[in-house]
């Protein structure tokens, strides 16, 4: 009973969304790496806890897992904001 109601509702909803593409991916990757470079040097205690096994620890200041997760989270926020802004400006 419930599945037939859901199928009926799905058939009436128009598909207005665009398909996903790779245009903003390099911007998000670059923003994450930039924030990781900055965060390893600006966080008060970047080495407290388990170390993140990164390929070039000296470049990234050998951050802990918590520093890495915080940097990636903030990098994604900055990157998505940049992609949305550039998309609204028509650059991407």
From Swiss-Prot:
As for membrane topology, the entry says: Multi-pass membrane protein
Would the keyword Transmembrane helix turn up in this protein's UniProt record? yes
Subcellular locations according to the entry:
Cellular thylakoid membrane
UniProt keyword Nucleotide-binding, yes or no: no
Q: Which PROSITE patterns match?
A: PHOTOSYSTEM_I_PSAGK (PS01026)
Q: Which InterPro entries match?
A: PSI_centre_PsaK_sf (IPR035982), PSI_PsaG/PsaK (IPR000549), PSI_PsaK (IPR017492), PSI_PsaK_bact (IPR037101)
Name one matching Pfam family.
PSI_PSAK
Q: Where are the transmembrane segments?
A: 21-43, 65-87
Q: Which domain of life is it from?
A: Bacteria
One Gene Ontology BP term is: photosynthesis
Which GO cellular component does the record give, naming just one? plasma membrane-derived thylakoid membrane
Keyword annotations for this protein?
A: Membrane, Photosynthesis, Photosystem I, Thylakoid, Transmembrane, Transmembrane helix
Which NCBIfam families does the UniProt record give?
Answer: PRK13216.1, PS_I_psaK
Family statement: Belongs to the PsaG/PsaK family.
Q: What is this protein called?
A: Photosystem I reaction center subunit PsaK 2
Q: What is the lineage of its organism?
A: Bacteria, Bacillati, Cyanobacteriota, Cyanophyceae, Nostocales
- Gene designation: psaK2
């Amino acid at each position: 009973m419930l599945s037939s109601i859901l199928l009926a509702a799905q058939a009436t909803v128009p598909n207005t969304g665009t398909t996903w593409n790779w245009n903003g991916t390099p911007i998000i990757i670059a923003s994450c790496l930039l924030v990781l470079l900055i965060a390893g040097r600006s966080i008060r205690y970047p080495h407290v806890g388990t170390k993140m096994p990164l390929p070039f620890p000296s470049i990234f200041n050998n951050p802990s897992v918590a520093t890495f997760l915080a940097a990636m989270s903030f990098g994604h926020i900055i990157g998505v904001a940049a992609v949305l802004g550039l998309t609204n400006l028509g650059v991407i």
